[in-house]
Amino acid sequence: MQHVFIIGSRGLPAKYGGFETFVEELVSHQQSDQIKYHVAQLSENETGKHLTYKTADVFEIKKRNFGAANVIFYDRDAIVYAIKYIKSNHITNPIFYVLGNTLGAFIGHYMKLIHKIGGMLFVNPDGLEWQRSKWIKPIQLYLKYSEKKMAEHADLIISDNQGIEDYLKTEYGSIASKVIAYGTNNLATVPGVDKPCLDEHGIQVGAYYLVVGRFVPENNYEAIIRDFMVSSTAHDLVIITNHLGDPYFEKLRQLTNFDQDKRIKFVGTVYDKEQLTAIRKHAFAYIHGHAVGGTNPGLLEAMSATDLNLVFDVSFNRNVALESALFWQIGRLTEIMSQAENLEPKKVAILAQKARQIIAEKYTWGKIVGQYEELFLNES
């Protein structure tokens, strides 16, 4: 039996972001009975309580009260507890799969402890987290240093995008590395609902551009809105994001005066998966503005559900969308929108078919989980 200890997600079942969804899907699509997953879970309870979720062993780690440093102590405490658990249960050759670089500045010490019990350390670096504008400069510097240390010490770096692996090898030289993408479900085959819940905003089916994503500057909201406002399109711009109460919303309004353009509709968040799938399916086109990170779940979902996708032109996005999308750069989205609206339906259908084919061949959760299981069973 191969025991895999997953550190760095908030736990199971998934309630939050990308890492949590990844762990949920990894456990839900488990194919091999020769793997036992042990998943750390952030908790208000005392460290050490064990729960069972599907086939996984979930072990709780008590949340500390150190503010922004909580994530560092969470990873540290999870590794320390897992090592004690491994010793007391006589587990041999465990794999530690750490999600994110947060603990990187201190990983050398814990790497020695892991090796001492015959274990291996695999790390998913989570894109280029240090580049995110939400972090103040000292935190960016810490995350960059942590990235460096993880690359130096890990037995294997698992990137979810070829662009991430290329960056790490360019930045840090020869490292043990492998690419396994993030996954998605095939939304094209999901019935969803007949009509998305957009009537209250006066939005018509098939007559809107769609943006879905976290409300952060590096997702290029300003660039998208500026170019949209100078366009002559009759379509609306529907933005699904967590903007309510965020100071960036007012800053963005002051920068762009988007409130003067009635075509721009901030509709808040949509957590109902069937509704969100319907909104994706009925969009004229999806605009993907993400500039930082690896394989983005939102882009995969768009390629699976939306026929026409306008994708920000960076290597991470090109490595995913390939020839199935139209690519735009800052200041040129208006031009790409015009191009999109002049495409013949046959051309749109070809792009949609290419996108669905890419998803089916590379990004379904069944395929991704199969790649992970092969790695865990053969690389330990």
Predicted ranges, named:
Residues 5-7, 200-219, 225-232, 237-238:
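Conserved donor-binding/catalytic core segment of Leloir-type glycosyltransferases
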Residues 45, 184-185, 212, 236-251, ...:
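Glycosyltransferase donor-sugar binding loop
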Residues 7-15, 29-68, 163-171, 242-248:
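N-terminal strand-loop element at the rim of the active site
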Residues 151-179, 184-188, 372:
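A short, active-site helix/loop in glycosyltransferases that binds the activated sugar's phosphate group
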Residues 72-83, 93-126, 294:
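An aromatic- and histidine-rich active-site surface loop
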Residues 139-157:
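Membrane-proximal helix-turn-helix segments that form the acceptor-binding/catalytic region
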Residues 278-294, 307-308:
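Acidic donor-binding loop of glycosyltransferase active sites
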